């Protein structure tokens, strides 16, 4: 009886962290944007899925190819691509959920994994990007003094620590699964009585998962600019290490401004100003859009690999050559076949 009563309460989506039920004030105004979600989320999620699988799948293939020189940068980028690919694999299920009018058909366990995967990907991506930028900065400023910090072994250890911390800190999201509301099975939702806990979780995630990495990136960017202003740049341009460090941090900051900061900002505003019966449709829709942008970071990260990766372009060309060996063979076989034809005619 108690569970049935709680299922009738307004709910808040775990992944969007936004009201997901229908609330009514004195004027009986409908406070839901289910139609907007149904039209927006499926197509956006499927686009992200297509490009994300293409970009990250190819990137992982390139990173795993044997190469004469491997660096810690490639280790961080490989882990980032794996994180993105794991998250992207859940997007078709999310698209199906909203296409069915927020009706979940894939079972309780899969429902619990949805929210968990979103936040594990988001914050592991943030920390992989941050650590990658810091390592690039240290390699530029102290290329020989900090070799132990930028070694491949240290990179794998640091990646393992990031995975463990992010997965452990997000474990509480596995508490909430699917819930039957009449003929509809809801997913990605928490009951309203957990709003205080949700606000606390949001503040912790905002500070530790967004603001701290953002300030770290900003400081690295300013220090790199300071170093470049002191260094005499030759006519050939910046040194390779300087250029790659600057490119890495600039692309990472762009991803932060586009994907992570808008979502964390609007999520915080939405949670702190939300009240039962108070409709804020524009803020609600804006939050939905920023959530999609946060998910789209999985599509933007391959650009970082291409423009700032260590030997990524050379590795990509080498991998593509391996995928098309027939061209090299036909150049050698064709003259032989012509000669054989001439011999048979004689």
UniProtKB/Swiss-Prot annotation:
Keyword NAD carried by entry: no
Tissue localization of expression: Widely expressed, with highest levels in the heart, placenta, spleen, peripheral blood leukocytes and adrenal gland. In lung, expressed in the interstitial macrophages, and slightly in smooth muscle cells.
A Gene Ontology term for the protein's cellular component: plasma membrane
Record's bilayer topology term: Multi-pass membrane protein
Cytoplasmic domain ranges by topology: 64-72, 145-153, 226-245, 308-346
GO MF: cysteinyl leukotriene receptor activity; G protein-coupled peptide receptor activity; leukotriene receptor activity
One Pfam family, short name: 7tm_1
Disulphides: 111-187
Glycosylation-annotated residues: 20, 26, 30, 181
Extracellular compartment residues: 1-42, 94-123, 175-204, 267-286
Family listed: Belongs to the G-protein coupled receptor 1 family.
Name this polypeptide is given: Cysteinyl leukotriene receptor 2
Organism: Homo sapiens
